[in-house]
């Protein structure tokens, strides 16, 4: 297989795009670097497409490697033919390849292998040939009676076992049946327990294999795993056996009757159970792939939430018996103070808690409260909103997801960062910092622990981790990282920076003071020329005398950027002050094509340079809608059908989205209630962090369920 041509076809790309991209990947370049700084070579492929192409490249190379192994194995058995070799070369998937190799694979003990060991292969061959004029099978079988094969029936049964395995091993037959089951099969589930709980809807359930939704596949799988459901695929057996008869029945002889019996046995005992397993595995793989994609998109939106900058913030980690942990964080994330208050039951020390928080607010000029969304959140919200009204000094609050905060606070990393604080106070610090800069704080946590997906614990963990790591890497490099303030964890997500290099950067910073230029990176231990090439453009040095060091312009393009300023009669001082009207006017006047030729760079690179010079130090997150901040609190009992509310999308899943509307319980907007037009998936319209207008459909206080709609009931 020509892998380059295959990728061109699958991704609808030009030959030069694929060839250049493969070379860049093989040369050890990172995806963020290729996406950002090699646009001319790739035709401006984005990082998501590059990751998909890279994953597919790995699969196809593994496929070719497997082909070589199978060819070697069959050749060693001296069974290779031109036809088999051609079939192997034409195989497009691992499944096709396994079907071809099945007859040659070393087998464990089977009924067919036992029959072969008894010398019944020639009898099976004679029966399978179904030649006219051949003696009846019963007569042929008499020649094979021995001490181990006591009678004709035993001989014929052994022959049928051999034929059954031959039919099962036929790649063409399996391909046809697999297609038929995929097209006409039905997934069924039945209750295996009186108490089905959340699986009640699957008690007597069926849905076509070809159309079953991924989230239902995963739900059924989980129900089966928990012993609540019995799951299988229903399929009309006659469709399959007719296909097999057409392939294996040659003449209408007495031997044909035995071949038909062998086919029937082969399908029921060998083929269908195997294909049923394969198809269910394929459905699960597709469902997991889709779920991982949703998880990745949700994680991306969570990481890319706009930071609430420039405010001293109090982080509140709510609790009942152990109290509410308090941490005061400066505008730059430094811990100023900590404590514990007890405004919730069983203590109810509300007045004492108000005095403590009021004192902290006045002492540090606090402007924001960040409240964790765990135990006792509602009581803490009520307490905070009452205090905000009493203080009347412009404070607002936001409930922050504390998913993963406990994992982080108990980690070795948190202990190194805050050795003086106990685990609970570290959580309060993390909650406050999540409001100030979600990306910088959340990179410290395993993205699987952030909890914005569905069935994440049922996913193949290796694939989930790889996908989420890619998402985190893409987000970090999209935003850029301040070289002088970033934690080792944030630095370690920058393209080309390993965890060891990240620690060395921090050590260099501590030993020599703040970086004053990007070029100083070259002095960091283990950060060689390749690593510098990959990471430099994503690291910012706001303190540098060179304005380009605080942009995403790569050092390799500095000469071109400076020449651009010269051509446009613009100074670095103009760029620092935001006086960019002349730059934009000159670029428009000369034209990007002519200007790119004059500077000897590609147009995409020129466009990126102009964009960066127009907004040095820009944060792409600042262009997104700001988080929804609150000053008052509601309870579920305050909600009424038809009530209009503003909310924040917290999670997007296959069947809808969960929206935080300011009560302790998130409400569900079912996919059918998102818009009046047809959508394939909620993510077509919504993403995590979106601020949306919703209307209450129904509230069930006992079950803690809130149904919402985004369709205006008044229209």
Annotate each language-model stretch with its function.
Residues 49-51, 59, 63-73, 77-315, ...:
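Duplex nucleic acid-engaging cores and interfaces of nucleic-acid transaction enzymes
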């Amino acid at each position: 297989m020509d892998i380059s041509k295959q990728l061109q076809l699958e991704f609808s790309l030009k030959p030069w795009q694929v060839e250049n991209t493969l070379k860049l990947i093989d040369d050890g370049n990172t995806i963020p670097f290729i996406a950002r700084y090699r646009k001319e070579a790739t035709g401006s492929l984005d990082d998501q497409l590059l990751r998909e192409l890279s994953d597919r490249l790995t699969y196809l190379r593994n496929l070719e490697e497997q082909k070589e192994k199978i060819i070697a194995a069959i050749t060693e058995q001296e069974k290779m033919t031109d036809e088999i070799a051609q079939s192997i070369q034409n195989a497009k998937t691992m499944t096709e390849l396994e079907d071809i190799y099945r007859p040659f694979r070393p087998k464990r003990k089977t009924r067919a292998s036992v029959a072969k060991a008894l010398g019944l292969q020639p009898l099976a061959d004679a029966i399978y040939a179904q030649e006219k004029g051949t003696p009846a099978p019963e007569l042929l079988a008499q020649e094979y009676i021995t001490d181990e094969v006591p009678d004709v029936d035993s001989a014929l049964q052994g022959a049928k076992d051999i034929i059954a395995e031959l039919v099962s091993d036929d790649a063409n037959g399996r391909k046809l049946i697999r297609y038929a089951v995929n097209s006409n099969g039905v997934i069924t589930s039945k209750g295996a327990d009186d108490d089905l709980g959340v699986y009640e809807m699957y008690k007597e359930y069926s849905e076509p294999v070809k159309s079953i939704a991924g989230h239902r596949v995963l739900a059924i799988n989980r129900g089966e795993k928990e012993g609540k459901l019995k799951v299988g695929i229903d399929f009309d057996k006659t469709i399959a056996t007719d296909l097999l008869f057409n392939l294996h029945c040659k003449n209408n002889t007495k031997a044909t009757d035995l071949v038909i019996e062998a086919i029937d046995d082969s399908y029921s005992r060998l083929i269908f159970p195997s294909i049923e397993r394969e198809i269910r595995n394929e459905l699960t793989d597709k469902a997991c792939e889709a779920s991982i994609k949703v998880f990745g998109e949700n994680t991306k939106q969570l990481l890319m939430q706009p930071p609430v900058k420039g405010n001293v913030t109090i982080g509140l980690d709510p609790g009942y018996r152990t109290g509410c942990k308090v941490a005061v964080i400066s505008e730059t994330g430094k811990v100023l103070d900590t404590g514990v208050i007890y405004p919730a039951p069983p203590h109810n020390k509300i007045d004492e808690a108000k005095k403590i928080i009021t004192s902290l607010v006045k002492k540090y000029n606090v402007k924001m409260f960040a409240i964790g969304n765990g135990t006792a959140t509602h009581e803490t919200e009520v307490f905070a909103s009452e205090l905000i009204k009493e203080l009347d000094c412009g404070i607002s609050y936001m409930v922050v997801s504390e998913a993963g905060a406990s994992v982080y606070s108990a980690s070795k990393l948190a202990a190194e960062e805050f050795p003086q604080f106990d685990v609970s106070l570290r959580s309060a610090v993390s909650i406050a910092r999540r409001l100030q800069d979600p990306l910088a704080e959340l990179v410290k946590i395993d993205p699987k622990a952030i909890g914005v997906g569905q069935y994440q614990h049922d996913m193949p963990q290796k694939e989930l981790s790889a996908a989420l790591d890619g998402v985190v890497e893409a987000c970090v490099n999209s935003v850029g990282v301040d070289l002088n303030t970033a934690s080792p964890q944030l630095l370690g997500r920058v393209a080309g920076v390993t965890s060891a290099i990240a620690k060395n950067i921090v050590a260099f910073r501590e030993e020599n003071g703040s970086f004053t230029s990007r070029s100083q990176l070259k002095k960091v231990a283990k950060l060689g020329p390749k690593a510098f090439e990959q990471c430099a453009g994503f690291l910012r040095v706001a303190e540098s005398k060179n304005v380009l060091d605080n942009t995403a312009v790569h050092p390799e393009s500095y000469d071109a950027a400076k020449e651009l300023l010269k051509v446009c009669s613009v100074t670095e001082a103009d760029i620092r002050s935001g006086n960019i009207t002349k730059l934009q006017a000159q670029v428009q006047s000369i034209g990007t094509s002519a200007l790119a030729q004059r500077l000897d760079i590609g147009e995409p690179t020129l466009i990126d340079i102009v964009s960066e010079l127009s907004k040095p130090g820009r944060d792409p997150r600042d262009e997104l809608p700001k988080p929804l901040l609150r000053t008052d609190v509601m309870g579920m009992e305050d909600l009424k059908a038809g009530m209009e509310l503003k909310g924040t999308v917290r999670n997007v899943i296959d069947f809808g989205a969960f929206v935080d509307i300011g009560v302790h319980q998130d409400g569900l907007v079912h996919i059918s209630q998102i818009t009046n037009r047809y959508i394939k998936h909620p993510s077509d319209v919504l993403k995590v962090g979106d601020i949306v207008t919703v209307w209450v459909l129904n509230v069930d206080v006992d079950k803690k369920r809130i149904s919402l709609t985004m369709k205006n009931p008044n229209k």
